[in-house]
Amino acid sequence: IASSSKMLVAGVLLSLQDDGLLDIDAPIADAVDWGSSNPEITPAHLLSNSSGLIGLFPDPGYGPYVCQFLPAGTLQDCAESIFTSPNDDGDITPPDVAFNYGGAQWQVAGAVAEAVSGKSWAELVNETYVQPCGVESLAFNNHFTQMGEGFNYPVEFNSDPSTLIATDNPNLEGGAYITAPDYGQLLLMHLRGGLCGDEQVLSQEALDTMHADRIAAAYDGSAGGAGTGYGMGWWIDRESGRISDAGAYGTVPWLDLEDGYGAYLVIEATSGEGNDLASQLYDIVDDAVNAG
């Protein structure tokens, strides 16, 4: 589901904050030994694409961060190499100065989650989402060098996780796979105060943190245009209030928090095609829901 993975990643870290294992506003140096290389960066910076590290664009293959796309090695080793690399020193900025979407900052976020919990990313996903919400299809891998061509849907996957090799270095910003009904369950969790059935997956405070326009509050930032904000894993349409987490392969999940509904558009194509179709559906879906 490519970048529709991001809200899932943010939720894992907010769950750890709910459990008292992580403070998303504290320097990650408090959580990992190698965090002192960039002592001002916090998990909140990472999850809002505001860490100052190099984002996914304009160069997805940015040399110092290339391990994010490789299934070899571990998430810990990859994140440490990213965070401590001297080869990005001329390119990075202080945190909360600019919005740099995606990229290796999400690997760092996942490694911090592993470190404070003492669990692997796979174990965290299982405990946070799979078990309480029954979303058995959800897992992460690192498919980018295994199949497909970057931002085009990897048709070789064919909805079969066995086509991927096992990895201890999943791609966090874009490596999740999940069926549409299971993703829908997680959207419902966001609309039901963090509940999956009787299980409290995330607190309402955690959800509010993810859904709020952090970049506006922190540094009067915008995400590609004055009308677009970003929370933690969620794009925010500042005019309508709609939040979304679209992916490169055509998935577009969105929530209307005011009206209390969500939708999940799934096509196996490109982000441009997915977003174009979603833009045609937003008002149609909204009118249908509000018509009762």
Describe the function of each predicted region.
Residues I215, Y219, G272-G292:
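Short, gly/Ser/Thr-rich active-site loops of penicillin-recognizing serine hydrolases
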Residues G175, Y249-D259:
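Short, surface-exposed beta-strand/loop micro-motifs that present aromatic residues
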